[in-house]
Every structure is written in C-alpha cells, then in structure tokens.
C-alpha cells in the first residue's frame, strides 16, 4: 500500500503548536507575521500572505493566475476534492491527467 496523506509530526512541531495555543494570539498576531517572514526568506519572495488552509491557497492561486471561463487546467485525479474545486470556483475547467496504477504517479 502507498501511504497517501500521512502526516509526520516531530516533537519540536508539537511543542511549537502548544506554545502558540497558550499565547494570547491564536489566528493572527506575531507568529503569523514571523511565519510569513520566514517563508519570504526561504523562497526569496517579496511578499507572503499566510491563509487558513490549502483550499484557500488554491483559490488564491487561481485568481492570481487569472484563470477564466474556457481555460482548461490539467490536474491529477489523485488529490483532495479542493484541487478540482478551486479550478471550477475560478470558472475554469479541470482536465484530469491519468496516473499509473503501479506507483500512482
């Protein structure tokens, strides 16, 4: 079986989450700004906006890329529903590309 969607949590990740949960800020505040600055530094960008989940991020990508009606966007069928939904939400059409049964690539 190929593990699909399994997360890996390290002790320092868990400690960081607990520390943040005990802070006065949960959904915004200094940790979000710190996270955005670290991403800018790591990837060499000019701007970064952290969002609440991957679905929101995918929808923003569609807007940023200017997807519109009659655009065909190729994606994998082996993904969460949000992958195709963000394409439809941006008025484009998802086109599913086949995957290999042996290794799901």
Language model regions located:
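Conserved PLP-binding active-site segment in aminotransferase class I/II-type PLP enzymes
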Residues: 1-64, 68-69, 89-90
């Amino acid at each position: 079986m190929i593990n699909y969607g399994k997360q890996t949590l390290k002790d320092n990740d868990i400690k960081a989450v607990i520390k943040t949960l005990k802070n006065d800020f949960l959904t915004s505040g200094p940790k979000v700004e710190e996270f955005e600055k670290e991403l800018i530094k790591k990837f060499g960008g000019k701007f970064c906006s952290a969002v609440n989940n991957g679905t929101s991020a995918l929808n923003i990508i569609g807007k940023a890329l200017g997807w519109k009606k009659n655009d065909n966007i190729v994606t994998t069928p082996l993904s969460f529903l949000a992958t195709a939904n963000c394409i439809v939400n941006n008025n484009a059409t998802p086109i599913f590309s086949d995957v290999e049964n042996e290794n799901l690539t």
